[in-house]
Amino acid sequence: MDYKETLNLPSTEFSMRANLVKKEPEMIKKWHEMDDYNLILKSREGKPKFVLHDGPPYANGNIHIGTATNKILKDIVIRYKTMRGYYAPYVPGWDTHGLPIEHRVSVEMGEKIKGMSPVEIRQKCKEFALHFVDVQREQFKRLGVRGDWDNPYLTLDPKYEKHILNIFKTLVKNGNVYRGNKPVYWCPTCKTALAEAEVEYHDHSSPSIYVKFELEKNTYIVIWTTTPWTLPANVAIAVHPEYDYVKIKVGNEYWIVAEGLLNKFAAETEIEYSVVEKFKGKDLEHKKAKHPFMNRESLIVLADYVTLEDGTGCVHTAPGHGAEDYLTGIKYNLPVLSPVNEEGVFTKDAGKYAGLKIWDANKVIIEDLEKLGVLIKSQKIEHSYPHCWRCKNPVIFRATPQWFISVDRNGLREKVLEEIKKVEWHPKWGENRITAMVKERPDWTISRQRVWGTPIPAIKCKECGEVFLDEKVIDNFVNIVEEKGTDAWFELSEDELIPEGVKCPKCGKNSFEKTYDTLDVWIDSGCSFEAVIRSKGEKFPVDLYLEGDDQHRGWFQSSIFMSVAHTNIAPYKSVVTHGFIKDEHGRKMSKSLGNVIDPKEIVDKYGADILRLWVSSIDFFDNIRVGKNIIQQQVETYKKLRNTLRYLLGNLNDFEENMIVPFEKLLPLDKWALGRLQEVISQVTEHFEKYEYSKVYSLLNRYCTVELSATYLDIIKDRIYVEAKGSIYRRSAQTVMYYILQSLIKMLAPILVFTAEEAYQLSPFKKYETVHLEYWPEVKEEYIDNQIMEDFKMILLIRDDVLKALEEARKQDIIGHSLDAKVTIEGLNDNVQMIIEKHKDYLSEIFIVSDVEIGNGQTKGEFVSVTVEKAKGEKCQRCWKYSEDVGKDDTYKDVCPRCAAVLKGERK
């Protein structure tokens, strides 16, 4: 007789093949039709709020692996918090102003842009930004990210711009905004000032030259520079007051350098010398050297920032081309020379170099220095150099009139530092990082010489040329913006923009013209706490900001400065950061290396759940690695998780909630499995709370593959398949499988949003329209029997000893399948022996063998001695266990008594 039809074989529509690429878009459509975002929020009305505020990605292209990772991490947080019972809204946003967009539009428009008005350029920029908002929105939705996609916040929205200007007015009112002629980062390609956060460092080849300035007849002070083009602006040479300096004789000349750099300098320049004098740097103060090619003198000044790392300890100083140089210039009342125009071309003030591009001038200046006999050494060096974040070209320091935020006025910096201490930083080193940055940061350059941005409503007096900010002008403009947007600044006349009664603070006249600088985009996004959260009555400060760790100098910093200036408190309670994404070998991704991973390719090939699983697998607090092999590993892990879900669903096809067996009636093994589930829920919950998703991933992966598939589910397979459908033996195991499946689906739901939904819809416990309306599994202490947990901890260790012995017997051809075996075991100590005796009735099931005898074993394991031999009797044709009682039943001659009783309906 074929007994296959008498077995309780698994059956489910949850297929082994995931087919995520086809199924996921169908689920997204279904969620959209049910309005899942609002449906889920409504279900949590009146509950405690959890607000994660979205840092806006830039709307200037397709999403990349970094933005995809960031959005998935945020989605995991929101979904988990929602399941924990929080009212957790998620309003996505986009950064839509600024240079990157204007640059792209300029490239697309080509020569046409020269004939376009500012308003026309702004309109093109707006269209470009809104197009990519739509593109990115669909791409994020395809990743399974849930949010208020129909109502995102956009920094170009007039309602948003109004709040930018109101916060700007607060800064003006508090005296934190000033105009100054200071050296700032300047991009000659994009022709605009840049803030520190808009500068990236890349390797760059620069000239490295040693030049001598004549101090007195036949005596020279030697400087070193990697920017020869700044020499026309040199007005001083800085030395350290406390360093020792030496006068050395080289040929018939005397040169001055720092003693601490003498050996390095001599080796690089290949000179022979003798030391003739030694003195402190402060002894050189106020002496004057002759500029090598400009008709002026260079003052010797003192500066503590001079180091003994490179060069000569005598630092070329041009206040118009360096932040430290500028401060030294103020101290010594030096002129701020910057003979370079917005395109990086020398002006007439550079003398013979006028009209030359600065990078081309390097070569000419070096040649001239050589002709003048003052060039000691010239070579090339590779070093890290600042580049524009948008065009990727090198930037310069250039003194120009700009608007700045003073970070020290009114104690702003100190207040920010105090607020940083109150924030919870994940990882903890984030606090040290942002603290160091805030302590060291210079005043903030906030003006940009571009049209696509929030205009700075500054006006210029036609009579005396004074450029200033007036609160009445700002107030009037705020009212106009709410109705007409910031284009109004470019469209309306001065009479419409400037209210009556405004007078020039310098000369008292009232004839003005507009200026056209726009605000740094970091001001835009830094004001989101007000525009998106506080002004709408949302919870403030918010619970969480979650971004890449580059935002310590970007959005985290701009937000806390704006918030403290406007509200006196930090805008966030907690900050979580993730690292940069690199390839499998830890290299930066680049098109030239061919190692760029496109999230769209992963989603199109494997499905979004695979990408989401990868995101959960990474220890994202550190730098993150991804590549084809790593993604393939996630595909394999996913298959194991899916197969576990499928097995559980398949074996619960005839099980309903009313069939649940009370805990006290469960079999001991099932009690252990249910208790272990509580431990897993507790550990997973703890990891979610700490944003340690890689630990969630590892724990659930091990739980499914080792503890369930290879252990518990393998052990109970006999009971599930062979025992009577409604028997206590089967229902006891099914009860625990029910709880495991229910909890597993819920714990996977924030990560595998699509797979969890698919499994939930086919589960016996479905009670909501979507799994994402479900609540997080709770730890039930009453399901933890401490004695059972302790006993089975040992039993599973004993099982490991037995499995090793079975494997050895298999190699020796004593057995084939483990059910061919009879095992004899004995504990190696009294405690082990006691546990064996106590649970002897279940040991054959746990070891998956036909018979277990307690007695002296031949092979010593760690906890028991084991003997494996061929089981006695015949093989039952239904359960495959060996028994000496096979054939004793008159009706079923080839099965064991247990199977005969099942077939007759006698086993309950």
From Swiss-Prot:
Its cofactor is Zn(2+). GO terms for cellular component: cytosol. It comes from the Bacteria. A motif ('HIGH' region) lies at residues 57-67. The keyword tRNA processing does not apply. Zn(2+) binds at C876, C879, C896, C899. InterPro entries: aa-tRNA-synth_I_CS, aa-tRNA-synth_Ia, Anticodon_Ile_BEm, Ile-tRNA-ligase, Ile-tRNA-ligase_type1, Ile-tRNA_ligase, M/V/L/I-tRNA-synth_anticd-bd, Rossmann-like_a/b/a_fold. It is found in: Cytoplasm. Belongs to the class-I aminoacyl-tRNA synthetase family. IleS type 1 subfamily. Catalyzes the attachment of isoleucine to tRNA(Ile). As IleRS can inadvertently accommodate and process structurally similar amino acids such as valine, to avoid such errors it has two additional distinct tRNA(Ile)-dependent editing activities. One activity is designated as 'pretransfer' editing and involves the hydrolysis of activated Val-AMP. The other activity is designated 'posttransfer' editing and involves deacylation of mischarged Val-tRNA(Ile). L-isoleucyl-5'-AMP binds at E547. IleRS has two distinct active sites: one for aminoacylation and one for editing. The misactivated valine is translocated from the active site to the editing site, which sterically excludes the correctly activated isoleucine. The single editing site contains two valyl binding pockets, one specific for each substrate (Val-AMP or Val-tRNA(Ile)). Monomer. ATP binds at K591. This is Isoleucine--tRNA ligase. PROSITE patterns: AA_TRNA_LIGASE_I (PS00178). GO terms for biological process: isoleucyl-tRNA aminoacylation.
